[in-house]
Amino acid sequence: MTEISILNDVQKIIVLDYGSQYNQLIARRIREFGVFSELKSHKITAQELHEINPIGIVLSGGPNSVYADNAFGIDPEIFELGIPILGICYGMQLITHKLGGKVVPAGQAGNREYGQSTLHLRETSKLFSGTPQEQLVLMSHGDAVTEIPEGFHLVGDSNDCPYAAIENTEKNLYGIQFHPEVRHSVYGNDILKNFAISICGARGDWSMDNFIDMEITKIRETVGDRKVLLGLSGGVDSSVVGVLLQKAIGDQLTCIFVDHGLLRKDEGDQVMGMLGGKFGLNIIRVDASKRFLDLLADVEDPEKKRKIIGNEFVYVFDDEASKLKGVDFLAQGTLYTDIIESGTETAQTIKSHHNVGGLPEDMQFELIEPLNTLFKDEVRALGIALGMPEEIVWRQPFPGPGLAIRVMGAITEEKLETVRESDAILREEIAKAGLDRDVWQYFTVNTGVRSVGVMGDGRTYDYTIAIRAITSIDGMTADFAQLPWDVLKKISTRIVNEVDHVNRIVYDITSKPPATVEWE
């Protein structure tokens, strides 16, 4: 069975990308209902969509104005496909603008809305079935609809938005001015589920077993009888990729585990024992720590660190691949969140990712990225579906650049050791407290800041270590974890007493946004 035939058997809802930083959340929410969903460029044609054969289309939000000269548009024939369409924020304005309505700066129609607002439903609608007549939603728009196209009618408004929800049931076109994909829209999940199940007719039978079948077929068709190299870090993402690839192509896969000197405590030996021993992956271990640390000496800028590490990573692969024959592909554990934070065609780059933006232009391999449509929690579910043990699947996320981006400023062996040892203590105590499944991610950072302290009878002037612990569902947004004070106290006491050159511990209580998870 080909990949296309597998895809045709799977119901899917396509999200067209108009530039919102969080439009991937739309696809993520829809997948929660057992419906496959993915992002496509707004430039896609009606014919291309017809070939994909979705049961529904969502037009995402975005930062532009639909009446601007550089506005992102849509193939008008998409409206004639007979496929249900939901426009969100910019998407609703685009439907209105293209079908004969009017969109103006919000000041001419009421006020701009940024933050939670109360939606007042004026009519019943399939889209809002089971939700209250008044509900809190997240608004974020500088433009507003003042006239709706022929055939549409008002469903809901807010105090500052005359048309907050509209629909044309005859043509299966729906528009909402707010963002149901974010948690601040209290009934947002219900609205998206109504669209997927009630309006689009989704069965809700998408699962990780479907994904495994589809990806294995895709990998086999892409690779054929050629060979693949996988950069194995020992983290969840690359480990899951390794097991998936081995299931697809067996001994055509060679894993290269690069010890760049930026790993967590004892991580190298753990990787070899777990994946090389238990799963039988063919792993070549390369000690390239001196190469990386020499290149990173005196480099303070985090983007330069990422680029240097990304480039050198591939050059190490080139060196190893030259010793092998017939290697054409490089596999990576790139996730959906990596792609959006590195910027899409329509979205601004937040930070370059090692798996996305750190690759040299003269790279000698074709890329295979089996996880690039998945979020972190879906990767864990995939690992379980592949039969991987929980100690691997629930391993703490670890960035490709390793501890390099958990040391602020220039990297030294001394700084690396403070992070390596303090991180080990943090992970040990979180596990002892039974919190390792409740906290999404937790690690320590050498802030690069030194402060005065007193230890024993002497004055110290040593490093400040920050603890970062977050809770999240999908990694796109996050809150700081409210760890028990007694646990934090024990962690702090142990780090200061057991780790050399550290005399102060601080706790990062910043959410994402405005911060990112990693400090660099």
From Swiss-Prot:
Its EC number is 6.3.5.2. Keywords: ATP-binding, Glutamine amidotransferase, GMP biosynthesis, Ligase, Nucleotide-binding, Purine biosynthesis. The keyword ATP-binding applies. This is GMP synthase [glutamine-hydrolyzing]. PROSITE patterns: GATASE_TYPE_1, GMPS_ATP_PPASE. NCBIfam families: guaA_Cterm, guaA_Nterm, PRK00074.1. It catalyses: XMP + L-glutamine + ATP + H2O = GMP + L-glutamate + AMP + diphosphate + 2 H(+). It is an enzyme of class 6 (ligase). The gene is guaA. GO terms for molecular function: ATP binding; GMP synthase activity. Gene3D superfamilies: 3.30.300.10, 3.40.50.880, HUPs. GO terms for cellular component: cytosol. SUPFAM superfamilies: Adenine nucleotide alpha hydrolases-like, Class I glutamine amidotransferase-like, GMP synthetase C-terminal dimerisation domain. Residues 12-205 form the Glutamine amidotransferase type-1 domain. Residues 206-395 form the GMPS ATP-PPase domain. Pathway: Purine metabolism; GMP biosynthesis; GMP from XMP (L-Gln route): step 1/1.
